Amino acid sequence: MFTAFAEEGHKRTQEIEVNKGWNAIFLEVDPEINDPESLIEGTPIDIVATLYRRKSTAQFSSDPNVNLLREQGWSVWRAKDRPDAFLSDFPIIAGGRAYLIHSKTEFSWSVRGEQSIFSKINWQTNSFNLVGFNVEKNAGPSFEQFFKHSKSHKESPIYRLKNGKWVLVEQKGAELMKSGESFWIYCDGASDYSGPLELKMRSSVAGLVVGKSGGSVDLINLTDHPLDVSMSHHVPSGKIQPIDLAVRVIDDLYDPIKTEPLDLGLGKWSYPIKMLEAREAIKVPFIRQADEMLNNQQKSLLEFKTDLGTNHWIRVTSVR
């Protein structure tokens, strides 16, 4: 049996501050309405563009208009009241992607949808990539803090959009990354780097699936210093999602090695995992409380935060 809660459990709302003119955004959710015409209806946005695979490693122009009109690999949507609307070739708007959008005025854009599937970035080697990352709103890391431990990016030039032009980030230690922002960065060689905290899951295609045998998330500190990591569990208001952390008990008299739940409640909760030392990796196991499950399948979100200001969102599906 599937319920509205099962569908709502993976959803959240992303708030994006849109400026007049060109904006470089990173969309973190898969919109409930992914048709560009319907999603953008009623907003002052008149152009949306995203870059799929570049066919060359050519340098980009500092002018967004040139990128859209002359470079290969762009899909562009244009509002129907524009004279060039017939050139639109943009089927859907999906999460986990960087976009250039043009707005006639500034406004606050609320986009609701399912958290996009967690995955590592598919970097194009020896090329500039238009990318974005999940970071804390108003408290993100500096570009240096985020990229200094990636050999493919630590010395790479970064360009962010300011007043409609791409501007080189000259002081990486002083400029902070922003939630919902995308930027250009050069990838020197092959890489799958996605931030100072790496997450791994066996069932990463569908998110974290917690079934009869449980599930787990591996956390790896890729930096040369400690990282303070915390975790939050998000469920729709008034709903429950019975999953718990699992702990290993090794000194029980009758069952010397067994798994027991660390009861954190049935709804929303937060838990300070631990301080991860430099290069340390840990496994965070979960078990579902089948007796408390109201449906055969229930969904929620896990958010992992670091004291650097990075965060990772993961879809969770518990199966009875």
Predicted regions and their residues:
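N-terminal exported-region signature
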Residues: 4-197
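Short, solvent-exposed loop/turn segments enriched in Ser/Thr/Gly
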Residues: 93-97, 179, 210-217, 280-282, ...
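Asparagine-centered strand-capping/turn motif at beta-strand->loop junctions
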Residues: 103, 187, 217-225, 235
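Short, hydrophobic/aromatic beta-strand segments
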Residues: 110-112, 195-196, 225-233, 243
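Terminal connector regions
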Residues: 157-162, 275-320
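Intrinsically disordered, low-complexity Pro/Gly/Ser/Thr-rich segments with frequent PxxP/GP/PP motifs
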Residues: 240-293, 311
